Structure formats: structure tokens, C-alpha cells
Design a protein with these regions (language model features):
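Hydrophobic residues in well-ordered beta-strands that form the structural core
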Residues: 75, 81, 102, 154-156, ...
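Helix C-cap/helix->beta junction micro-motif
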Residues: 96, 149-150, 302
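Phosphate-binding glycine-rich loop
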Residues: 29-78, 92-96, 102-104, 169
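Active-site phosphate-binding strand-loop segment of PLP-dependent enzymes
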Residues: 108-190, 196-198, 342
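Short beta-strand->loop structural element characteristic of the AMP-binding/adenylate-forming
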Residues: 99-109, 307
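PLP-dependent aminotransferase class I/II
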Residues: 9, 21, 36-44, 48-54, ...
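N-terminal "arm"/small-domain region of PLP-dependent enzymes with the aminotransferase-like
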Residues: 1-31, 36
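Conserved coil-to-alpha-helix start sites within the AMP-binding
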Residues: 85-90
Length: 365
């Protein structure tokens, strides 16, 4: 049985008429930049997921940039970022002239290791980006205790974790600012680029709102340095159609993950851990195996799509070579990057397809 790694067309076909009607209404009303569609989404996102506020932004990278501006990071500052994540997690620090310092992750959870965080802190450390990778919350109690002790500005990168909770509390409500992505492949994806900024602190929310529109306090009067980080109306319209389905999609992802966890029995494979502190939303289901490339080739022959997320940790990316964190410096991130493979997990998968993936994985020898 052929099982694609991801098939967005299934979701979009099911929502086609409703989405096109919403887009037509936005088009006819000329609500192209921010506007009522975005405002409606901001209110719904906040109320549905338990946030005090939401600011729609132009991409998932935009709120990381905005949060780094608000954090006051500058050329003499260091910002700690986990080495195993998408590169946008480190761009905010880079954009404002700060130095990303990469820290190692835990095996199994793929999230920031609190001990590695503590070891990476220097007198120049001013901030921290915590990534709730693949939908699993990081260990926020330990991480926030370290951050408070050192006076760090904490950005929670929730791009892959919309709807996830840490000990019952939504991710994004622990740090100073939280960022979300609505890239089409995300658990809640738009039809193009989109993101959101959330903060439990009203002062940070208001500053981000100002930065989003060029720092403009009133028309053509600019109080602070800002940028163009606005969400467009079409994305707001599409996300308004999709948001009511998020809970059901998340439940289906969890059911698929549960089926994988119960059914995969492959010697040498490490499956995602399920620590008691976090309720994962399973943006990815990533396993590791010492013969990863051979396993992936085997699955391809069996018709199972896979992906490598992420094959090169950030400290070994060419653009960060001048920072000097070379090969061997972050062994867990390097080992995971060399051995990880992600299996299909999206809400439209059938049980028969999931069982076919399990059978194919278990048949590897």
C-alpha cells in the first residue's frame, strides 16, 4: 500500500467550498492587510487555545524576529538556541546582531536539555529560545527556573506545537513571548505564509503590536523602529475556516501516534518518548535508527514516504560555521540528526495506511 509522507490535498479538498467562499468574501471586501478576517482569527485563536491575546503575523519567522527585538538582544549578547530544530529558531538573534549559542537536546524528547542550557550560559547570555519540537513541550519547569535565576528573556517557539500543553498549561504561557507558524504543513496551516505572536505580558503584547506595523503610533507617525510583519487577510480567512477543525485533527494525530507506539517493534529503533509532563500534538513522528538510510530505502520500496527532519543540526550549518561550535561539540544533536527519520502522520491517514507503515517498519532487517 502506498502511504505518502504528507498529502495536503486531502484536507484542502474537504474544505474547498468553505475556504473559497471565505476567500471570495475577503477579496470582495478588499480586506488584504490585517483587517476583520485577521482580527476574527486572533480572537478565535486566543479563546480556543487559552491565550490572553494573539497577533497575526506574516510568517512563523516574523514573531521570532519581533520577540528578539523586544528582548533587546544586541551585538554583544548571546541567545541560547537548541541545536536540533529548524533554522528559523536562530534567525531572530541573528537578525538583531546577537550571537546564537547552540545547546544540546535530550534523546527521545528532542527538546532542549536543561543541563545543557545551564552549561551554555555565560555573562553575555541575555536570552533563550525554547523549541517545543515536533509537538512535544520542553521541560519548562526546569528551563524557566534556570532562566529566572539568570534573568533571561525567554522566547517559546511553538511553531510545531499549537494546542500542546505542559502539565495542563498551554505552551507559550511560560516565557516572555511565544511564536507560532501557520506554514501549510503545520498542524494548523494556512494557504501560504502566516504566524502569530502571543505574550502573557500586556506591555510586550502592545510593543509587538506596534512593531508589526512599522512602529506606527498613528498614520505616518512612527514612535519606535518596527517592520512589516502583518498577516494578510487571505490567510486570516483560511485560518478561520480551519481553526474549528484543529481539535479533531489533533485527536487524530494522537491516535495515529498511539498506534505507532503500540505497534512498532524494530530492534535498534528509538521511538518518541512520552514523558508525563507534556501533551504532544505530534507534528512529526520521528524515530531514530543506527541504519537510518537503509531503513528509509526499505520503506521507500514498500511505498512508505518519509522525511529527514533535520539532517544537519544548526551548529554544523555553513552559515553558523564562524561561531566555532564544530563537529563533536553537541553529541546528542549530532547523533539524532544522523539517525532520525520521520514517518507519515497527518489526520487524513487511514488506520489501514498506519498499519501498513507499521508492518513495513517491522519488516526491516
Amino acid at each position: 500500500m502506498k502511504v505518502p509522507f504528507l498529502d495536503l490535498a486531502l484536507q484542502h479538498r474537504a474544505l474547498r467550498e468553505e475556504a473559497l467562499a471565505a476567500l471570495a468574501a475577503t477579496y470582495d471586501a478588499n480586506r488584504f492587510c490585517l483587517g476583520s478576517d485577521v482580527e476574527d482569527f486572533e480572537r478565535s485563536f486566543a479563546s480556543t487555545l487559552g491565550y490572553p491575546n494573539t497577533l497575526g503575523m506574516s510568517s512563523g519567522t516574523s514573531p521570532i524576529h519581533v520577540a528578539s527585538m523586544i528582548g533587546g538582544f544586541g551585538p554583544r549578547d548571546e541567545v541560547i538556541v537548541p541545536a536540533f530544530t529548524f533554522i528559523a529558531s536562530a534567525w531572530g538573534a541573528s537578525y538583531v546582531g546577537a550571537r546564537p549559542v547552540f545547546a544540546d537536546i535530550e534523546e527521545g524528547t528532542y527538546t532542549l536539555d536543561p543541563a545543557a542550557l545551564e552549561a551554555a550560559i555565560t555573562p553575555r547570555t541575555k536570552g533563550l529560545v525554547v523549541v517545543h519540537l515536533f509537538g512535544l513541550p520542553a521541560r519548562m519547569d526546569e528551563i524557566m527556573a534556570i532562566a529566572r535565576r539568570h534573568g533571561l528573556f525567554v522566547i517559546e517557539d511553538c511553531a510545531q506545537a499549537v494546542g500542546a500543553r505542559y502539565k495542563g498549561t498551554p505552551v507559550g504561557l511560560f516565557g516572555d513571548a511565544a511564536t507560532f507558524s501557520f506554514y501549510p504543513t503545520k498542524n494548523l496551516g494556512g494557504c501560504g505564509e502566516g504566524g502569530a505572536f502571543v505574550s502573557r505580558r500586556p506591555d510586550i503584547h502592545e510593543r509587538a503590536k506596534l512593531i508589526r506595523v512599522h512602529g506606527m503610533v498613528k498614520r505616518y507617525h512612527h514612535g519606535i523602529v518596527g517592520g512589516n510583519f502583518r498577516m494578510d487577510g487571505f490567510q486570516g480567512a483560511v485560518l478561520n475556516v480551519k481553526l474549528p477543525h484543529l481539535a479533531a485533527w489533533t485527536a487524530r494525530r494522537r491516535a495515529i501516534a498511539g498506534r505507532y507506539l503500540a505497534g512498532i517493534r524494530l530492534d535498534g529503533a528509538t521511538l518518541p518518548s512520552t514523558p508525563g509532563h507534556g501533551e504532544s500534538v505530534y507534528h512529526q513522528f520521528t524515530i531514530t535508527h543506527p541504519r537510518r538510510d537503509a531503513l528509509r530505502a526499505h520503506l521507500e520500496k514498500r511505498g512508505v514516504g518519509t522525511d529527514l527532519i533535520y539532517p544537519v543540526p544548526l551548529h554544523l550549518q555553513e552559515c553558523f560555521a564562524p561561531l566555532g561550535q564544530g563537529k563533536g561539540s553537541l553529541p546528542v544533536s549530532e547523533r539524532v540528526a544522523d539517525s532520525c527519520v520521520s514517518l507519515p502522520i497527518f489526520p487524513e491517514l487511514t488506520d489501514a495506511q498506519v498499519d501498513s507503515v507499521i508492518e513495513a517498519v517491522n519488516a526491516f532487517a
